[in-house]
Amino acid sequence: MNGEKLLSPAGRCADPRLVARAARHTADLLPGDALHAVFLRSPIARGRIRHLSIDAARSAAGVTAILTADDAAQDGVEYMVWTGAPVRDDGAASSESQRPLLNRAVIRHLGEPVCMIIAKTQKAALDAMELIDVAYDADDEIALSIDDLQGPLVWPGSADNIAAFHRLGYKPAVDAALAKAAQTVRFDFDISKVTACTIEMRSALGSIDANGKLCLTTSAQSPFALHGELAKLFDLPTDQIRVIAPDVGGSFGMKGALYREDALVVWAAKRLQQAVFWSADRSESFISDEHARAVCGTAVLGLDADGLFTGLWVEANTDTGAYLSRRTKGMLNNIGGVAGQYKTPVIASALTFFYTNTMQTSPYRGFGRPEATYIIERLIDKAA
């Protein structure tokens, strides 16, 4: 290949189709006999399910099935697969949190799915959901702040709400460098929790293909990761599961995980031997999509008389939500980004992940790099 061709800009072939309303999203790919699913979700952030009766809803017009945690347990898919969460640098296991596909007892955040209602139409499913008799006992205290270590425990039986922690670098060397510095600059940071607002809300279609394989069609940006996790969840060889990601109407990180709804529609399709489709509405997305950021802490930068960096210490606390996942450790993966493009002889950090009664957090737009870059650049601004 000659140099001229190598440096020529590549044409964009997808744009005309997308801007001409010819995109093919998950909702455009439904088979004619697809069933529609909706979820009864917890209206409280912390408490217990006191009573649940689905008898009246089960006999409603158009209803095919109403699935609960008991059904999931019966089929051996009660909990999400928990892999690759943050580690502790003292060698101890992280505080493991089992995330149920459908909740049967303890509510840990607003919007946890309790029942899956499946019907011939979405309207029929929504009408049936109104007939479900459910009562909750809400707790008066809710763990919303990572600052309150002695607050109500998200996971009773634990010593505190620390999910995991990790230390990087050699702190004594940084302490010595800061003690000798001509100037030290401290920056207390608080990076707010955010959520996404994509054009296409999350949607998922579970089905059985012509070869008898389980199939998930979903608006996801990481189909290969989802493929492996589904295989573990259903205890199947990877060649018995397919994940198809058609055109995705926005994500920026939020659609990078295997969500409970993805697993649930595949399980329902397997159980009913019929395609099952679910799509969130805007309000549902707000409480069921993974959140991001939610990092606070302190950073200290040492400088010599000439303004050269001598040492950097970063202590960061991350709100991980009620459950850990493989994507929780975004801040850990890229905490090295605090070094930036600058020469700093010694750097150390302490990262602590806290449980709260909120939706779990995951990385948006950079997997921890934006937070790390913000910290060092604001420190330099203050030093200047």
For each of these PLM feature ranges, what is it?
Residues D33-H36, A60-T64, N103-R104, L110-V114, ...:
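Short coil/turn connectors at secondary-structure junctions
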Residues F39-D70, M116-A135, A204-L272, K329-A339, ...:
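Alpha-helical support elements that line or immediately flank enzyme active sites
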Residues T83-A124, G253-A305, T361-A384:
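Glycine-rich and small/hydrophobic secondary-structure elements
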